[in-house]
Amino acid sequence: MKNIIFVFLSVILFLCCSSDNDAIIINEPVKIPERSIVLAEQATKSIVIIDADTYQKVWSWDAAKSGVPTERQIWFSNPSEVKPVYNGKYILMTASGGAVALIRIVDSKLMYYAQAGSNPHSAELLPDGNIVAVSSTDTKLRTFVTDTIKGFGKFYASYEFPSAHNVVWDKKRNLLYTTQDRKLYSFTYNNDSKAPQLLDKTLVMELPNTESCGHDLFPVQDKENSLWLTTNENIWQYNLETNKLEKIYPFYAVKSVSDSKDGILMLYPTTQWWSDGLINEKGKKLFTIPGAKIYKGRWMQDNTFSYPENHPFKLGK
């Protein structure tokens, strides 16, 4: 993102999920710096944005303060994915409690959410704004019609997919990628906004048998044809154009990797599956948030591998 985004911390007085006009908001101006990082923070069940220079929190969101019915708030426990989307003005998230959600940063409004299965690990935007999510415990890929008028929905189609942990859209090739253990697969999309379906499952490549459990899959920022892929053993880059697979770092069980011109961020778990800070490519801890249980961290920047450079959000279904 080239410009400083002005956002507002919000006090939501009424339910904020059914339309753009049904929330009364008291705004307090806050600046999100150009260099910032978004975190999936499980200790507070929240999404947090921090300043990348000071590592101070500048924005946060949690379901309990966002009009989510009490009985559904458990869906948002243990946030497991955070992706800046729509030119960094929204966050696409999942939580291991079951949620997939789209959040608008400017007023912290929950634009859309749904139950995405047992232990969702990641989600992705499709070209028409619909969503696909992956859940690892019930081993499913699911598509969702993103109805931001109602603000809440259910999955449209479900596909059996063991070891489902990640999902990335490739706008150049019009393909969706996801890993099944050591194997990277692609799907095509039927581009039906009212009936979204994934088609043509195809094996793209297979990691060496020394690897296990493909975890994070994410575009390499400065290489238009390459993807990061973390496993239980190493961190890799795969070039879709040349079919070249390269081992980059010998870090094991990394939950997320994200690079920018300012460096590389990785979540290396130090306690069970989380840590209280991120590390760089040299293994140096960049910051510590006392008491935090961070599961993923990503640079707040445009992802032009997956989305158009100018990617406006459209209200609707």
Model-inferred region functions:
Residues 14-32:
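Bacterial Sec-dependent N-terminal signal peptides
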Residues 70-83, 117-126, 162-169, 209-220, ...:
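Repeated scaffold domains used in trafficking and secretory/extracellular systems
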